[in-house]
């Protein structure tokens, strides 16, 4: 119990430190990946997480989710860390992530008895701009979200409030990015509190092929998350209800017709929190205020950290699996976690 309390205090201190040093620290870290513009094969060490509840290792059900396993990830490769978003392929194994150093991270989740057991075939590479140079060179390093629509990948970049399109299916991590047109009011987002959530419903879903962006903590006049549907030159504005001091850190689509929001909270007294909400896509309409059911809430009594990425796939048994990842802020007292849950009820 004392060890858990000490870890909580250290993690709170780490988040405070990361918040205070974010402008200088993130940019200097981004500089370290500019020297290589080609993919680098890396080794990721994975320590299994057998239970989600620090107080009851036998417990597996948490709200509407069932814990299937997790990994704490480390690597001796210096640019590794800061995982901000993840997409998992339909096979449930291959994944693509972005980091807040402006890097791609891709690899393969290895399973044993249906549980994550390791990471194989991992590579990192700088995210490239249209000129073939790393986006970090121009200060576009804080990649926070990733989506796929109509065969193209889109990355949301905070601080500069850009969305950049890549032909990843054709060129992989060597794809060159082209900024897409975004609404002028993106310029009014709260600094470093913007494009954490970017997703696109697949064919057959409401709003199929359109980009959905929900801001982290860029709030409207009523204190709710400013949100957008982007469809070429057409823009639909709506808001997501903010509650209980949670802010949006990522999102994904739960086929066929729901939006999953991953959220986090932080305060010196309550420490770190995580929440997932399920919201019907059909509720997204011009100027609407939307909300949804809470699937899970967790704090540092559970195996969480600064949870920043969420993805969905179906396993061979037909179960819906949620994959979550955390951003360690390149801090030695935080962790890069990969957690998996099955959606089993509400």
Where do the model's predicted regions map?
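Sequence/structural signature of beta-propeller domains
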Residues: 2-5, 12, 20-346
């Amino acid at each position: 119990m004392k060890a858990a309390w000490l870890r909580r205090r250290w993690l709170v201190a780490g988040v405070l430190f990361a918040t205070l040093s974010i402008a200088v620290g993130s940019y200097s870290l981004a500089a370290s990946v500019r020297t290589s513009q080609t993919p680098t094969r890396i080794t990721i060490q994975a320590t299994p997480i057998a239970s989600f509840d620090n107080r009851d290792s036998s417990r597996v059900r948490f709200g509407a989710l069932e814990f299937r396993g997790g990994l704490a990830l480390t690597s001796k490769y210096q640019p590794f860390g800061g995982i901000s978003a993840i997409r998992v392929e339909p096979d449930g194994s291959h994944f693509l992530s972005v980091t807040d150093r402006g890097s791609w991270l891709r690899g393969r989740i290895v399973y044993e008895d249906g549980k994550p057991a390791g990471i194989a075939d991992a590579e990192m590479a700088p995210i490239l701009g249209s000129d073939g140079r790393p986006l970090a060179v121009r200060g576009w390093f804080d990649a926070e979200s990733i989506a796929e629509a109509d065969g193209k990948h889109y990355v949301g970049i905070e601080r500069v409030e850009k969305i950049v399109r890549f032909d990843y299916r054709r060129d992989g991590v060597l794809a060159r990015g082209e900024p897409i047109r975004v609404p002028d009011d993106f310029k009014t987002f709260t600094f470093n509190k913007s494009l954490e959530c970017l997703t696109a419903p697949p064919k057959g879903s409401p709003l199929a092929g359109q980009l959905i962006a929900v801001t982290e903590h860029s709030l409207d006049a009523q204190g709710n998350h400013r949100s957008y549907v982007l469809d070429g030159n057409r823009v639909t504005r709506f808001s997501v209800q903010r509650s209980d001091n949670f802010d949006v850190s990522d999102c994904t689509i739960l086929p066929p017709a729901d939006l999953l929001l991953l959220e986090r909270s932080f305060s010196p007294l309550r420490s770190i929190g995580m929440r997932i909400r399920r919201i019907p896509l059909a509720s997204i309409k011009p100027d609407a205020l939307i909300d949804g059911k809470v699937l899970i809430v967790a704090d540092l009594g559970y195996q969480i950290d600064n949870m920043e990425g969420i993805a969905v796939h179906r396993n061979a048994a037909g179960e819906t699996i949620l994959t979550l990842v955390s951003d360690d802020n390149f801090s030695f007292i935080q962790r890069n976690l990969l957690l998996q849950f099955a959606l089993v009820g509400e």
